[in-house]
């Protein structure tokens, strides 16, 4: 059984009706009912959650945190002896194709990690990483879907510019991204090798690649990942 808490009556009613889950007004009520808690709030709200009157979280609870930028060390300061696992999921979990990463706090056990991994694998793929790499993970897979959505939108715009109906252009672009991603994962070949295999000498694709290189597309993606990772790092420091 899954439960959630929210101070807003309308939010609780919506969660109950849309997802058929048990809902509670306070975190204290929820914590009394389970030993597995998911912390899914904004960084600025974390202290308020843990300072809630009547909330008792201890070593008997496993806390899976998806709070951006917040380290297990900070979370453990609120829950001495607490079993914390930090997680960075992504938007694609909503269609069961998520790319989630997790790293354990100092008190998390192997059984805890197995439990977290099983939850994440129910909505996609899960990767254990060093906590020092979580900001980079945020830049690549956490924020990555937004970059890809922008790319699909831009490719569709290009198709419309060239005469395609909008709905056809979007489906072609999205399916192309899906197929290309599957090709990378299933063949195990380096993306650059696969790119070269599509580019015939003097052909249409290499001309398109040249246009992208003229506009520094690689640097743009690299800078986007770095900017997102740096923002995650600053958020972890409270900035």
Name the predicted role of every residue range.
Residues 1-18:
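NAD(P)-binding Rossmann-fold cofactor-contacting core
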Residues 9, 18-19, 26-102, 106:
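Rossmann-like NAD(P)(H) cofactor-binding subdomain of soluble oxidoreductases
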Residues 74-83, 99-136, 148-186:
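Internal alpha-helical scaffold of NAD(P)-dependent oxidoreductase catalytic cores
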Residues 84, 134-139, 191-196:
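Short pre-catalytic strand/loop immediately N-terminal to key active-site residues, enriched for Gly-Thr
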Residues 88-93, 138-148:
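Glycine/serine-rich anion-binding loops at beta->alpha junctions
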Residues 174-239:
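NAD(P)-dependent Rossmann-like dehydrogenase/reductase catalytic/cofactor-binding core
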């Amino acid at each position: 059984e899954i439960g959630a808490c929210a101070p807003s009556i309308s939010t609780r009613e919506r969660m109950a009706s849309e997802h058929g889950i048990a809902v509670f007004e306070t975190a204290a009520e929820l914590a009394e009912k389970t030993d597995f808690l998911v912390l899914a709030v904004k960084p600025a709200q974390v202290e308020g959650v843990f300072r809630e009157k009547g909330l008792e979280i201890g070593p008997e609870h496993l806390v899976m945190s998806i709070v951006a930028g917040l380290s297990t060390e900070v979370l453990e300061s609120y829950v001495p002896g607490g079993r914390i696992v930090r997680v960075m999921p992504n938007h694609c979990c909503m269609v069961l194709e998520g790319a989630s990463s997790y790293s354990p706090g100092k008190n998390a056990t192997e059984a805890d990690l197995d439990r977290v991994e099983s939850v994440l694998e129910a909505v996609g793929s899960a990767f254990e990483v060093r906590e020092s790499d979580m900001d980079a993970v945020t830049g690549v897979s956490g924020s990555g879907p937004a970059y890809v959505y922008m790319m699909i939108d831009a490719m569709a715009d290009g198709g419309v510019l060239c005469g395609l109906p909008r709905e056809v252009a979007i489906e072609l672009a999205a399916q192309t991204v899906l197929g290309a991603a599957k090709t990378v994962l299933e063949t195990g070949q380096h993306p650059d090798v696969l790119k070269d295999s599509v580019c015939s000498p003097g052909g249409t694709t290499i001309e398109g690649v040249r246009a992208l290189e003229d506009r520094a597309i690689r640097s743009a993606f690299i800078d986007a990942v770095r900017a997102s990772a740096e923002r995650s790092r600053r958020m972890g420091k409270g900035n």
